[in-house]
């Protein structure tokens, strides 16, 4: 069988735990902090799903919506709107926090509207 790599983008508001999820999935140790702006560029890591399938996990900067207000938010939008980007996701995982679930759902619905298969993770 041919090896396959699935691209999984971790997306969410700033400071909801995207990088913590990334570190758990990849075994890497990217810096985390209890304030926005820690991740300002996309980071990638690989995790093995089974004998022939790997997942390329893409940790993206925090954004509140797909209407960019900053350079790091623009990183998210440029990836999600460019199907020719080498990291265009097969699956988007929107990481949210239960305390601000309603605010986080705006981003979730915007990504769903792009017709990218999307999962919601409540951290």
Task: Give the ranges of each region predicted by the language model.
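Conserved G1/Walker A P-loop phosphate-binding module
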Residues: 1-71
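Conserved C-terminal guanine-recognition region of P-loop GTPase G domains, centered on the G4
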Residues: 48-51, 75-123
């Amino acid at each position: 069988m041919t090896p396959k790599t699935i691209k999984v983008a971790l997306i969410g508001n700033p400071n909801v735990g995207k990088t913590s999820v990334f570190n758990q999935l990849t075994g890497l140790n990217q810096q985390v902090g209890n304030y926005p702006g820690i991740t300002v560029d996309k980071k990638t890591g690989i995790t093995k799903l089974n004998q022939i399938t790997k997942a390329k996990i893409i940790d993206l900067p925090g954004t509140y919506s797909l209407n960019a207000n900053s350079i790091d938010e623009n990183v998210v939008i440029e990836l999600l709107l460019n199907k020719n980007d080498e990291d265009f996701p097969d699956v988007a995982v929107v990481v949210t926090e239960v305390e601000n679930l309603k605010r986080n759902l705006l981003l979730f619905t915007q990504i769903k509207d792009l017709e990218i298969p999307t999962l919601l993770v409540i951290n």
